[in-house]
Amino acid sequence: DRPEDPVPLYVAASGESAARLAGRVADGLICTSGKGAALYTETLLPAFEGGATKAERDSSGLERMIEVKVSFDRDRQRALEDTRHWAALALPAEDKMGVEDPREMERRAAALPLEKAASRWLISDDPDEHVEQIAEYVRYGFTHLIFHAPGPDQLRFLEQFGSLVLPRLRARFA
């Protein structure tokens, strides 16, 4: 059975071609944060718009979704340490190519200095600072934010982020 409303389909993109395809055929674009402003403002979002234009689609109704990597904790050191659980994200592509054994990937990630492991994350212990960090993605043009927290205690994150950061985000952007 088909649902009454069509299920929205998004295309994930990390480069220009996939972003253009998303603009041509999908209900939205999805990508991940932490890769530098130029990727979003000069490549992905313009290609997405260009794809929609080429397909004669009105892009104003299309979603621009981003998974924002956030590590928020009232204890800043804990927020920093939590990024260690996803340290592999900070490995350069050439260090991940051809690695088939997850234990080898874990070994490579564990060898990274903490500052490097944390480099793809927005890290803060201050709710207002965190809102400012996240606001960059709204300014780039993203319309749908998904938050990804790295630490093992997801309930702790949800309670703190949900009570301290989300109300400020909603007040500012809702």
Model-predicted regions and their roles:
Residues D1-A174:
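Active-site-adjacent structural elements that line small-molecule/cofactor binding pockets in enzymes
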